[in-house]
């Protein structure tokens, strides 16, 4: 064993003794790598980043741009402040012409992922998230250096996490704006009806934790602002309440320069109805999803049909615009009820140009929105008011921020947690409005007054000073 005596363990002391200070520099550099990568990586590949004196906002909508009016209104408002606007979303329907023609707005399509292979829900959801991840990553990379990224919530998965992570790592000067239309976890709860369900609680935590990293949070109601402060512990200084207001395309009939009769005679939806001038016209808009129970309306209309002759009520035409997963079920129920010619129900998918025109000739509108959270408001009522049309609406916590009973509309006494029959309430308010001309005229005047409150003025008052800038 004597020949192996020269092999002795000496530890690492000799390494430090003979290596010199360069080793310490190497160790220090190694330990600093995460920090260096986080701070310098965004600047190592600057090709393609947005730069210049004019500011840029990138708006992401995981929905159809043609039917996302609030986000399109944001785009127009930023454009008027001389921002470059990158507007990203689905292009299932053509966006409004004023968006297409705006020289400051560029539209970038996001491909709709459809379940053409009839995959189970979980597998399809996973596939959709992966596809959206790469699409969003590509767009974010193209817009790296944008001054602001504006997203809507819901949906929050996967877009909130992807956008936030990208900004924090690759585009750290970019500020994140979240426009809270509703709470995503409450929509998921429509499926489970249990706020303590693990998936619902996970999604609530996801929204609460990630939402706090936003630089600005915009809410559609004051109640939603209070919720974010009290329940999600958001900084109230970062929250702006921006109520929906109608765009310029929604105008009362008196402002259109055309008569009601001319519209009734020219549009296909009215042409096959005998004596259309005798009918009261109702309108409603829906996406045919579970949060709007159209069985309530059908039941009320059935009661109206059965009592029309006895109570001297006028015949009605109700136009329901929109499409969605429960549309075929709704149309089948209409067929089964076999309404008389005194109650005509039509479903139409209208263009963004035709929709305001049809609203303008209505006598009354109906909203069945109850809100999964109770603290959002339906854009459809804002559109109705823009055309000067009063509304019958179901009661829920935030509805008073938009509709005042007996002034610009009528609100049911019941809500979804009440023992009062909601369909009976809708029927009662319908007959009350059409039997009492004085009441109908009063709420009509109130709706016309609401039509004077416009998006542009409201946006400039609440948002303009925060986002205006000078190119000098």
Curated annotation (Swiss-Prot):
Cell compartment(s), UniProt: Endoplasmic reticulum membrane
Record's protein name: Chitobiosyldiphosphodolichol beta-mannosyltransferase
E.C. numbers: 2.4.1.142
UniProt keyword annotation of tRNA processing present: no
Record-linked InterPro entries: ALG1-like (IPR026051), Glyco_trans_1 (IPR001296)
Alphabetized PANTHER family for the sequence: BETA1,4 MANNOSYLTRANSFERASE, CHITOBIOSYLDIPHOSPHODOLICHOL BETA-MANNOSYLTRANSFERASE
Pathway in which the depicted protein is active: Protein modification; protein glycosylation
Membrane topology listed for this record: Single-pass membrane protein
UniProt intramembrane stretches: 119-139
Catalytic activity: an N,N'-diacetylchitobiosyl-diphospho-di-trans,poly-cis-dolichol + GDP-alpha-D-mannose = a beta-D-Man-(1->4)-beta-D-GlcNAc-(1->4)-alpha-D-GlcNAc-diphospho-di-trans,poly-cis-dolichol + GDP + H(+)
UniProt keyword annotations, A-Z: Endoplasmic reticulum, Glycosyltransferase, Membrane, Transferase, Transmembrane, Transmembrane helix
Superkingdom of the organism of origin: Eukaryota
Pfam families membership: Glycos_transf_1
GO biological process, one term: dolichol-linked oligosaccharide biosynthetic process
Transmembrane intervals: 21-41
Name of the coding gene: ALG1
GO MF annotation: an example: chitobiosyldiphosphodolichol beta-mannosyltransferase activity
Family of this protein: Belongs to the glycosyltransferase group 1 family.
Cytoplasmic topological domain residue ranges: 42-118, 140-472
Gene3D superfamilies xref list: Glycogen Phosphorylase B
């Amino acid at each position: 064993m004597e020949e192996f005596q020269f092999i002795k363990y000496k530890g690492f002391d000799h390494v430090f003794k003979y290596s010199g200070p360069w080793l310490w520099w190497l160790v220090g550099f190694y330990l600093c790598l995460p920090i260096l990568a986080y701070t310098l990586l965004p600047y190592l590949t600057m090709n393609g980043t947005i730069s210049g004196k004019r500011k840029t906002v990138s708006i992401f909508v995981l929905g159809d741009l043609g039917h996302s009016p609030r986000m399109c209104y944001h785009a127009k408002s930023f454009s008027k402040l001389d921002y470059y606007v990158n507007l990203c979303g689905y292009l299932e329907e053509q966006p409004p012409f004023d968006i297409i023609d705006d020289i400051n707005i560029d539209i970038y399509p996001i491909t709709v992922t459809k379940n053409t292979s009839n995959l189970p829900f979980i597998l399809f959801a996973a596939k959709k998230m992966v596809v959206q991840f790469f699409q969003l990553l590509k767009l974010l990379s193209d817009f790296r250096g944008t001054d602001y990224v504006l997203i809507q919530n819901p949906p929050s998965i996967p877009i909130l996490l992807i956008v936030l992570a990208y900004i924090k790592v690759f585009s750290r000067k970019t500020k994140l704006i979240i426009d809270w239309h509703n709470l995503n976890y409450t929509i998921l709860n429509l499926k489970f009806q249990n706020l303590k369900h693990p998936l619902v609680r996970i999604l609530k935590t996801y929204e609460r934790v990630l939402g706090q990293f936003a630089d600005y949070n915009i809410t559609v109601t004051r109640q939603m602002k209070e919720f974010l402060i009290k329940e999600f512990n958001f900084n109230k200084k970062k929250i702006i309440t921006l109520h929906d207001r109608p765009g310029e395309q929604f105008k009362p009939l008196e402002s259109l320069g055309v008569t009601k009769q001319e519209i009734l005679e020219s549009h296909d939806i009215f042409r096959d109805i005998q004596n259309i001038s005798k009918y009261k016209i109702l309108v409603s808009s829906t996406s045919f999803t579970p949060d709007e129970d159209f069985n309530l309306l059908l039941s009320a209309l059935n009661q109206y049909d059965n009592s029309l002759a006895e109570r001297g009520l006028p015949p009605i035409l109700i136009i329901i615009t929109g499409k969605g997963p429960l549309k075929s079920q709704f149309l089948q129920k209409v067929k089964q009820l076999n309404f008389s010619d005194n109650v005509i129900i039509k479903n139409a998918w209208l263009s963004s140009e035709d929709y305001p025109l049809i609203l303008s000739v209505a006598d009354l509108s109906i909203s069945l929105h109850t809100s999964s959270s109770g603290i959002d408001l339906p854009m459809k009522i804002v559109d109705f008011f823009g055309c000067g049309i009063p509304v019958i609406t179901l009661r829920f916590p935030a509805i008073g921020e938009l509709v005042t009973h007996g002034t610009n509309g009528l609100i049911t006494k019941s809500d979804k947690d009440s023992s009062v029959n909601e369909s009976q309430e809708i029927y009662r308010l319908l007959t009350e409005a059409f039997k009492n001309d004085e009441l109908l005229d009063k709420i009509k005047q109130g709706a016309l007054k609401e039509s004077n409150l416009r998006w542009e003025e409201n946006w400039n008052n609440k948002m303009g000073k925060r986002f205006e800038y000078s190119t000098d």
